[in-house]
Amino acid sequence: MTTEGTISFKQLHFHHPSVALQVNVCYFCQSSLEPPTSSSATCLGCQDSVFLLTPGDKALTLTDTLLLFCIDISASMSITSQVLEGKQPIYRSRLQFVQEAMLQSVRKLSETQPHMRVGLITFNNQVTLHGYDEFTSRFLLGAELIDGEYLKEAAFSFPSPPPLSRTRDCLQREILGLSESGATALGPASLVAIAMASRQPGSKVIICTDGKANTDLGNLEVEGTDARPCLSSTIFYHDLGEYAASQGVTVSVLAIEGTDCRLDELGRLADRTRGKVVIASPHELYTEFEEIIENATIATHCSVTLLLPPTLCVKGEREAGNRVTREVGNVASDTEITFQFGARQHGSQGEVSAPVAGGRVSVQLQLRYRQKDGHSMLRVLTADKEVTDDSSVVLSSLFLAIIQLNSSQASAALAVRGRFQDAKSEGETQRELMERALEYDRSAEDKMIYSKWLKTMDPIHNSLQNYTRRQSICSDTLQVM
């Protein structure tokens, strides 16, 4: 028995009164050798409750979150593409496309969210923190770009931008005045932007670039077609992702189509902070900016703990057993994560047997998170489910959208860790399960959703299959040699 579950975070800000309860034996933590008693066989408490973990803490003053554009203005951003203006073909540089997208975003934000604070950081062979009103721009260059602590202090000492209602005209002038030249100090610029955004949890950084970082700190440009970035740079971007997540900052990366930006490293930075990684054509930059901006962070420092009875165990996680905790970090209203769990194999934990058909099991989720006002919260959701050994009942009641989401997330997680064969097998197993479920009386909508999902996932599964086939051929060749 394998089951998937999904969590939506749309109601994290709701608060329900808690109920004080006392139990003698925890349903989830009881000894594996002790069978559940009548008092512990069912979970006590509310099905959905939210608790304030820090009732004595004073709420933080809520200020509008910060949005920082971190824009590449290196020499390669001068490369042009042909576009039609009416019927007349014209050429625009990559930077011109980025400028146009930013100007559109600023205009819309000034109308819809005039209190939002929007800042601009640009980078080539130096990093520029663009000023506004009476504050002049600050330039970081040379040896300053290899000193991480100095860069953080520079970000902390630079004043936060006032609301967009006051800075719109100045910001538009700064955007229009950009020009391309020099190298790509992406690493230092990312650190400065994240440090500056860390003043207000829930802030966003949007990095837009067309090339690999090629200055000392976070350098991703190395010699040789098969060479990997040096270990220090890999560690740098990993640590940067951890730092951003710990400060409640979401980092998204927009790479311009047709360029090599080493998205494996930058992707991990974005993934750790629940940001987006997008490869966009120059014409689509504004749309991508808007999607990132509109997806507001509603909570930070989120972790999710799944608790199962001893008769069940989690699957596909680093932690074994009937309990797992996953660090989620920043969450938006559309954030969804999934878990897999199933019946424990006989003899794997003392004498615990599989759940008995006709019985019931309870599953609990504990969500810890921090609100924008600084209060730490705990949300507890408990579900009580009947156990059955009738496969037709299970298959006819499966929620296909959850299976599809879990398949995508589980395969992606395996592929990111280099386990391509396991990712391929995971996708095939879930696909077979969905096809079996579709044999039962399913709605036309279910079948259409599955068809669309299949069309999206087929190229990915084919790529995994081709990659694992090449690995197998290379392995066979090495054995022959």
What are these regions (language model features)?
Residues 1, 216-219, 226, 230-376:
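Acidic, polar loop-rich interaction surfaces within structured domains
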Residues 1, 345-481:
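Long, acidic serine/threonine- and proline-rich intrinsically disordered regions
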Residues 3-5, 10-11, 27-30:
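Cys/His-coordinated zinc-binding microdomains
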Residues 9, 15-18, 35-36, 214:
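Short, non-ligating residues that shape and space the ligands of small metal-coordination modules
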Residues 19-23, 30-69, 73-85:
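Acidic, polar low-complexity linker/tail segments
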Residues 30, 61-160, 186-192, 199-209, ...:
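Von Willebrand factor
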Residues 35-39, 77-82, 86, 110-121, ...:
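Intrinsically disordered, low-complexity regions enriched in proline, serine, glycine
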